[in-house]
């Protein structure tokens, strides 16, 4: 895919434009803006950027969550979901989900981390081996 060809319905934005718009979103915080653009903005596998601020990302995530919500009784609307995400007020997705939810341009993990453990104490040889077995299965 060349820089002139964009995925259907998406508009490519420059890094500088995305940083400028994100800096506004983050109240002038350049570090937050550059980190967001570098790590979490929607990109294709060539590094082309398709979101210019976390607001765009929140719309993407809200659209995908709404798609799933429709499978259940009393689903939240896209606007309700967006309101929960907007400005990271009530729901703050972790890095992997921010990058991956609704991202059809790259394969991304939706999990960040998880806890392993055993009901029994792990401070014995047997407990250590049980932990090792769990880690191998990951």
Could you describe each region identified by the protein language model?
Residues 1-138:
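Extended catalytic cores of very large enzyme megasubunits
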């Amino acid at each position: 895919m060349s820089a002139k060809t964009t995925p259907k319905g998406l508009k490519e934005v420059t890094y500088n434009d995305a940083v400028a718009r994100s800096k506004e979103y983050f109240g002038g915080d350049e570090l937050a803006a550059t980190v967001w653009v570098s790590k979490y903005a929607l990109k294709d596998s060539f590094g082309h950027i398709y979101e210019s601020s976390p607001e765009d990302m929140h719309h993407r995530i809200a659209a995908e969550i709404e798609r799933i919500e429709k499978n259940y009784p009393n689903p939240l609307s896209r606007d309700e979901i967006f309101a929960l995400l907007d400005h990271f007020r009530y729901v703050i997705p972790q890095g992997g989900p921010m990058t991956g939810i609704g991202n059809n341009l790259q394969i991304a993990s939706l999990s960040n981390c998880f806890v392993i453990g055993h009901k029994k104490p792990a401070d014995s040889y047997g407990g250590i081996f049980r932990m090792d077995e769990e880690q191998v299965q990951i």
